[in-house]
């Protein structure tokens, strides 16, 4: 009797661990990262990224070995106090932030070998709207996605360049971004920037302002060459 109970207990524990690993595989902080990014989830099960402590320039760097967003969406916690989100309701303060230490730029850098599947909304819990750069050299598939409370949103297959703690630009050598049939809603952001070696459009991108840079290139934070969104079918900038 004890053996049967023990076997059932072990089976339950295994299934719980297995399910946690499957969930965690969608979003995994790079174990080799030097930054203190932590993962959590809301009471309703929405994944939360407690962003790393920003430097004195207001830059928060967050490195992942796997980075994906499913239909539940995802919350970037840039708040030093309890706050309410659209996706996950009430969220506790980010323990990595001291009072008045919110980031003004959040970099999400994927160091693994898989492309990112972005199939839900990304929301920033932040007193002020924040800039976000999502970088994955392996590529990104974006479908039925959008942003909430993000000022400027950049998705790229390039390498993010930093100098003296400042973001200075992006170098692109490879990588494909695919916009899926359900498209991307960027209307909550001031502008959306897509920077990749190649871009494949299967659906619409709707934004207030859209910048697209393709091919092998280097862009800076102050000067880049972009394709006019009006020249690309399926892309609409108000």
Q: What is each residue range found by the language model?
A:
Residues 1-10:
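Bacterial N-terminal signal peptides that target proteins for export
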Residues 23-238:
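Solvent-exposed adhesion/ligand-recognition segments of exported proteins
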């Amino acid at each position: 009797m004890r053996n049967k109970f023990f076997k059932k207990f072990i089976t339950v524990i295994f299934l719980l661990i297995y399910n946690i690993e499957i969930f965690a595989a969608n979003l995994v902080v790079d174990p080799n990262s030097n930054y203190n990014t932590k993962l959590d989830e809301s009471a309703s099960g929405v994944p939360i990224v407690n962003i790393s402590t920003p430097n004195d320039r207001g830059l928060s760097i967050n490195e992942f070995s796997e980075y994906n967003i499913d239909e539940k969406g995802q919350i970037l916690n840039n708040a030093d106090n309890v706050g309410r989100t659209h996706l996950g309701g009430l969220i506790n303060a980010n323990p990595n932030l001291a009072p008045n230490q919110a980031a003004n730029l959040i970099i999400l850098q994927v160091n693994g070998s898989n492309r990112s599947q972005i199939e839900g909304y990304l929301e920033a819990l932040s007193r002020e709207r924040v800039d976000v750069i999502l970088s994955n050299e392996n590529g990104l598939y974006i479908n039925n996605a959008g942003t909430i409370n993000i000022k400027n949103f950049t998705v790229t297959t390039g390498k993010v360049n930093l100098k003296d703690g400042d973001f200075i630009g992006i170098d692109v050598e490879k990588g494909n971004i695919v916009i899926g049939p359900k498209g991307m809603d960027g209307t909550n952001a001031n502008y959306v920037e897509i920077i990749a070696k190649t871009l494949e459009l299967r659906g619409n991108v709707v934004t207030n302002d859209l910048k697209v840079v393709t091919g092998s290139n280097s862009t800076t934070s102050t000067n880049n060459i972009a394709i006019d969104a009006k020249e690309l079918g399926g892309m609409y900038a108000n």
